[in-house]
Regions:
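Alpha-helix termini
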Residues: 34, 89, 121-123, 144
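Local cysteine-cluster metal-coordination motifs and their immediate loop/turn environment
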Residues: 1-4, 78-80, 102-133
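Short Fe-S-cluster ligation motifs
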Residues: 30, 118, 129-145
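FNR/FR-type flavoprotein reductase catalytic core
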Residues: 1-102
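Short acidic, glycine/serine/threonine-rich loops at helix termini
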Residues: 85, 110-111, 139
């Protein structure tokens, strides 16, 4: 979903910094697509076989002072989004942040409730119908059915 955002704004005066993480070099994909559309691109692998050793969240926070983002867009597995949310809270970052949740979706219309996530305040949301993009403070990333 983030590649489409980059494509949509490519002709604008907006600047994008992309940080991607993979398990190892064999899993790296779409490198050129993000590299060409971003003002800054950084990649990490868990084992250091491509780019920096580490993960995308570490890359992001390592470059945060240079980036000075107006908005943060993130997509990835729940543990990564959880680490991003914790890092933002620990640093007192008040920049709007939106996450695209990766959940199994059974029916795609919200009827089966397979993709339910818990929102802040105790309500539930259906990722397929109410999302999949939410403000990071709007969802509880620790909770799973």
């Amino acid at each position: 979903p983030l590649l489409s955002v980059l494509g949509e704004y490519q002709e604008s005066d907006k600047h994008f910094r992309s940080y991607m993480g993979f398990r190892s070099a064999e899993y790296v994909n779409m490198f050129g697509m993000y590299d060409r559309r971003s003002d800054h691109y950084a990649c990490a692998t868990d084992d250091g076989s491509f780019g920096a050793k580490g993960n995308a969240v570490q890359l992001f926070f390592g470059d945060f002072e240079n980036a000075k983002p107006d908005v943060i867009l993130a997509c990835g597995p729940t543990p990564m989004l959880r680490a991003l949310k914790a890092g933002l809270q620990e640093r007192g970052v008040r920049v709007p942040c939106y996450v695209s949740l990766e959940e199994r979706m059974g029916c795609g219309i919200g009827a089966c409730l397979v993709c339910v996530c818990k929102k802040s305040g105790g309500q539930n949301a259906r990722v397929c119908k109410d999302g999949p993009v939410f403000a990071i403070d709007e969802v509880e990333l620790e909770w799973q059915i």
